[in-house]
Amino acid sequence: MRCPFCATDDTKVVDSRLTADGYQIRRRRECPVCKERFTTFESAELLIPHIVKNNGSREPFDERKLRTSLSRALEKRPVSTDDVEQAIHRIVLQLQATGEREVASKFVGDLVLGELKSLDKVAYIRFASVYLSFDDVEEFSKEIERLRN
């Protein structure tokens, strides 16, 4: 790695350790020319797959869209912002863990349903009514029954 002080091409790693969250490596480096020390952080670049929509179009994953959908379903429900952020984090991790370049929007919707089911049943039904495109009250009732069991 290039020294930020004197631009020497090669520096020496003096110390390496994991950060507290365990997702990064903190490296303490020293330049052999100017003797300055500096810290770098290294983390894996995990790619989030593109989303293939029902009509076949593709778009990059948008965390804001996910947050908006969850917030809309959870509106006026007793669920903390921290719980919502953790749910988003779990969904993103599951998307990264697929290792795929593309996933169907249905896969993302199913992940959201799973998170909402454990967070708040009313929010789950709100999201499901739009996501599963209930055509009539009967389908709505069946989903509520499934949720009870």
Swiss-Prot record:
Alphabetical keyword list: ATP-binding, DNA-binding, Metal-binding, Nucleotide-binding, Repressor, Transcription, Transcription regulation, Zinc, Zinc-finger
unnamed ZnF: 3-34
Cofactor binding remark: Binds 1 zinc ion.
Stretches assigned to the ATP-cone domain: 49-139
A biological process term (GO) from this entry: negative regulation of DNA-templated transcription
Cofactor or coenzyme needed: Zn(2+)
Record-level Gene Ontology MF annotations: ATP binding; DNA binding; zinc ion binding
A Pfam short name: Zn_ribbon_NrdR
NCBIfam families listed in its UniProt record: transcriptional regulator NrdR
Function noted in UniProt: Negatively regulates transcription of bacterial ribonucleotide reductase nrd genes and operons by binding to NrdR-boxes.
Protein family membership: Belongs to the NrdR family.
The protein's name in its UniProt record: Transcriptional repressor NrdR
Native organism: Glaesserella parasuis serovar 5 (strain SH0165) (Haemophilus parasuis)
Upper lineage: Bacteria, Pseudomonadati, Pseudomonadota, Gammaproteobacteria, Pasteurellales
The gene coding this protein: nrdR
